[in-house]
Amino acid sequence: MDLVDPSQSAAAAAGTQLVKDEVAEKCQKLFQDFLEEFQGSDGELKYQSDAEELIRPERNTLLVSFVDLEQFNQQLATTIQEEFYRVYPYLCRAVRAFARDHGNIPQNKEFYVAFQDLPTRHKIRELTTPRIGSLLRISAQVVRTHPVHPELVSGTFLCLDCQTLVRDVEQQFKYTQPSICRNPVCANRRRFMLDTNKSRFVDFQKVRIQETQAELPRGSIPRSVEVILRAEAVESCQAGDRCDFTGSLIVVPDISQLSTPGVRAETSSRVGGREGYEAEGVQGLRALGVRDLSYKLVFLACYVCPTNPRFGGKELHEEDMTAESIKNQMSVKEWEKVFEMSQDKNLYHNLCTSLFPTVHGNDEVKRGILLMLFGGVPKSTMEGTSLRGDINVCVVGDPSTAKSQFLKHVEEFSPRAVYTSGKASTAAGLTAAVVKDEESHEFVIEAGALMLADNGVCCIDEFDKMDTKDQVAIHEAMEQQTISITKAGVKATLNARTSILAAANPVGGRYDRAKSLKQNVNLSAPIMSRFDLFFILVDECNEVTDYAIARRIVDLHSRIEESIDRVYTVDEVRRYLLFARQFKPKISKESADFIVEQYKRLRQRDGSGVTKSAWRITVRQLESMIRLSEGMARMHCSDEVQPKHVKEAFRLLNKSIIRVETPDVNLDQDDEHEPEDETQEGTNGDAEVPNGVNGHVNGINGHSQESNAAAAKPSLRLNFAEYKRISNLLVQQLRKMEDEDETSQRRSELMNWYLKEIESEIDSEEELINRKQIIDKVIHRLVHYDQILIELTQTELKGTGDEVVAKEEDPYLVVNPNYILED
C-alpha cells in the first residue's frame, strides 16, 4: 500500500502515507543486514548462493533458518516470532532488495521468505486466538488437498466514472474493492473494474490437516484446520502425508457463510412476493451485522516439510535414505545400540518379545507381523510395472485369542499406522472419497484409511464383517498398491503403498476344524489370494497353556511394570527398523534355486490332494515367499538373500497354507443309539472332539451296557480326508442321477454303486464286508449329523389327525439343496 501512483493529488497521497510502521521498517533493515552479513560455520556468506538461485524464473522464496536468525540477533528473532504477520511484507521487501543486489531481477517479480528450524512445535488443539499473527510450527496429517488456483494479492482497479487507476488495493482473503476513488473530484465508491493485466497474482492452494492419532486425547474427535499455501509451498504435500507447517495463524472471513443466498439484509428489502418469505426479510437489530461476524481461523503457511524421521513420520518407509544419512541423524550412543542389535544372535526372538511383551505365545503370528514391518523390496520392471514389496497378513481366530491386541500394538508402534473397523468402514472411507468444497463448490479428493496409511500399515479389524462391495474396493490397493477413482468428474490414480494387517472371526464364531479355511472365513477367493500370510488361532482347552495364559494375565494386572519383559525398548526397535529398511537385499543364485524348488513342492502337494492346502497355491504365493525372504534378510541387515532366510520364509508360509489338523471321524460314536427323534442334538459336535475323549462322552448318555460293549470292540474310525472323498463321490453320483434321469436312488442302490466303483480294490470277502459296513456308517452320518443327504419318507395319517413317519428300511436319498460341493 505504500507504493502510490504519482499522478494522484498531494492530498490523496498524504492520505495513504499518514502512518508508518517504524517497528516493521526497522525489522526490514535488520533482516537485510542479517542476509548480507551472516556467515555459516565455514566462514562463507550463507545466503548469498541462495540469493543467486532466486534469479531463476521458477524460484521466488528464500528459505531462512530461524536458528541462524537467533544467533545473529536475538531481539530481531523474538520480534519476528511475536509479530510475524505484521512484519512479513517488510521481510519480503528485504529479500527483494537483497536479491536485487546479487543479480539482475525483473522489476515486477515478487519475493517471499520462509522460515525453518523453529524450536517449538504446537498441536492443532493449541491454535487459539492469542496466537494469531505469531510465527508457529504445527505438525499434523494432510487429509484433503485442493487444486492450485491463482489468488489475487494486490488489485489494480479502474474507476468507471473518471477512468482513474487505483493501484495496489490489498485483498483481505476476499474480493476487496477500493473504499473510494483516489481522484479528489470523483465521489465514486462502488463502480470499479479490476484490471487483471496490472494486478498481482500468486499460486494459492488450500489444504485441510487433521490431528494425528498419536496426539489425540482418548475419546476425542480429531480437530482439523485449513492451511493456505502460497508460491513455492504449493503442491509440496499430498493427502496422507504427515508434515510440519511453519507460518502464522490468521483470521479470515468465512466465505461460505457470506455467500449464503437470501440472507443479506439489503437484498431482502428488494425481494417481494413469495420469495420474500424465503429470504426471511430484515430481522431487526438482533440480526444486524451477524453475517459480518462470520470469521474462521486459518493457518497461513510459508514453509512445509515432511515430519523429521527422528520424531516419527515417514520413519518406516523412507526408501531413498542411505545408511550414512541415517547414521548421521543418530547420536553415537544410539548408533552403537543399533550396531549391537545387528550382531545379536537371537535377534529374531528378541524383537518379537520386545514388540508384543503382553501377548503370551502365538510366536508364529509375532514373527509374521515382524517381517511385515520390515517388508520386502519394491521393484519396478522395464515396462514400468511396479511389484509390491509390502506384506499383507490376515489373522483368523476364535474370540479372545488376542487378534485385536496384535493390531493395537502395531498401531501404537508404527509411526504411520491407521486402525479401522471393517464393519464401520465403507469403500469410500477405506480408499478415498470425492467431496464438494464448501467455498469453491468444486469436487476434491479426501483421503481414506489406505491413503492415510501410505508408506505404513493399515490395521483392519472385523475384516470378515465388511460388505462384499466394500471388500472389492481394496482389491487394487492390496496388489497394485494404487487407488483409482472415477467419479463426479474426478479421475485420479492415487498411491496406497501400505501393508494390510487384518483380523477376522470364523463363520459361526468358532473355527471348525472339520472344514477348510475357505469355508471357515467369509472372504472371497481374490481377497484371500492377496494375503501373503494367514494365521489361524484356535482356542483349545489345554491345562498347561491355560495356566500359563492365566498366570500372565494376573501378573499384568497386579504388577504391570515388572511383568513386561522387553529386551529392547520401543524406540530402539524403531531405530533398528529405520536402519534395516534401507537395505535392498538381492537374491543369490543359490537362494533362487531353493525358492523354485520349494514352490514346486507346494504346487505338487496342492495338486495331489493328499494334504489338501487351505487355499489354491498360485504365483502369488511364490511372490509371498520372495517378499518374506527379503524381509528376513533385511532384519539381519544383509545385502543378499541367503537360503536360511528362504527356509524361514517357507516355514512361515507353510504354516499358513497347511490346513488345521482335523481329527479322524469316529463312525461308531452313536451307532448303538441311533436317534429315533431329532431332538438328540448333543452328539453333533463329537466329530470335532479330539481322540481319547469319545469314551467319556458316550458314557454320559446312560446306556451303560451298550457303552461297555462298545468299549470291548475297537471303534470304527476313518481318516477325515478319506471321509470327505467318499462324501463327495456319493453327492456327485446322486446329483448326476437327479440331473440325468430325474429320479432319486435308494440307499441300497447307492451302496451297491459305490462298492462296484471300488471293486478293483477289494481282494477278499472280509474286506467287502468291512467296506460295506464303512459306507453304511458314512451314509448314516451324512444323513443324521452332517445333514448333507436327506431321506425321503412316506407319511401316514391316523384317525387322531397326527402325522406318523413310517420308517423305511431302504429309503430314497437326495442331496440337501443348500449343500455346496467343495473343490
Curated annotation (Swiss-Prot):
PROSITE patterns assigned: MCM_1, MCM_2
Example GO BP: DNA replication
Acidic residues bias spans: 667-680
Catalysed transformations (reactions): ATP + H2O = ADP + phosphate + H(+)
Chain intervals for the UniProt region annotation (Disordered): 663-710
Zinc finger (C4-type) stretch: 159-186
UniProt-recorded name of the protein: Zygotic DNA replication licensing factor mcm6-A
